[in-house]
């Protein structure tokens, strides 16, 4: 034993390196063990649903999964097969997995797809936007859009996951929670933006549209990968060297919020009234004047015009902060000031890369149900629509309130109902 400790003391550098390696290896193995426990617990919970008996005349639910293997730098397929696929197969659904090979394929497949009971998106913001656009471009979208949609966040940017699922620093737990939310069947209605250019078919977005200098600098962050943790600030710093001040001129016309119709009450079985009461009700409805038609006066839409000079413009839904008790439906138009300094541009821009919901001080926010954005000819630049790049052009943006039903964590849904957004 004395010789052993003497050897360690004489070779203290190797001993220190070996101890660090052993500690790291133990921590890595412990993390893998915890991930396996999370997967096992999720599979056992899904098995409970799979063991439930269904009526003889009922059919097994059909689920169609649109998997983007290229998401998360090519790791999405492995993440899905290890963390989500076993849960879906154990819960008793008939699962069909469609792997996309190129950008836009999910959009085309959905326009031709036959009916299914559940649509599942396994990917990031881009994959989700393709699926939503494919659903709402169908000729029978009025009925097809009623199919609930599940979202398994596998991409680098999965903005909607913060709304639908509880926050988690563990990637495995985040994916298993999202998959179990589909199994449990709780849904929430989400708004959709319809964005239509002059020539192309409309594009549909769940988060929103961004146009401006913060967006332009943010997409160049990966170009400075060799700077490590300084790459975000470097992208915004070099952006200020190319051109300053960076202003975007445009005009926007918009209409105000619309009143949210009351939710339909749940149907409850009632006892059929007697024949005498039914005859009286028929006579009363026959002789009554059609007051509803006379009382309903359609007020013309009031459009407001705004000329703007901004460093960035964003048109977003309220899906990131749902308020079930709200009496109005509207989208947010945020016009950020063009008077910020270079230092503030670098600081705020670096924060917006991690949290696009942040805005500079002095930002003007408007509420609208639809708007028309006109940009000067030759302005160039690009839009970001749900983190996907599109050529900047004049567009019409319309809010489709509570258009799609998305599966969400029951805990998150309960939290929305008990503490609505302010």
From Swiss-Prot:
UniProt cross-references to InterPro entries, sorted A to Z: AGK_C, ATP-NAD_kinase_N, Diacylglycerol_kinase_cat_dom, Lipid_Phosphate_FormReg, NAD/diacylglycerol_kinase_sf
Region annotation (Hydrophobic) ranges: 15-31
Pfam families tied to this protein: AGK_C, DAGK_cat
Pathway connected to this protein: Lipid metabolism; glycerolipid metabolism
Example GO biological process: lipid phosphorylation
Listed Gene3D superfamilies: Probable inorganic polyphosphate/atp-NAD kinase, domain 1
Coiled-coil region list: none
GO molecular function, one term: ATP-dependent diacylglycerol kinase activity
Family assignment from sequence similarity: Belongs to the AGK family.
Quaternary assembly: Component of the TIM22 complex, which core is composed of TIMM22, associated with TIMM10 (TIMM10A and/or TIMM10B), TIMM9, AGK and TIMM29. Interacts with SMIM26.
Protein name, per record: Acylglycerol kinase, mitochondrial
Species of the source: Pongo abelii (Sumatran orangutan)
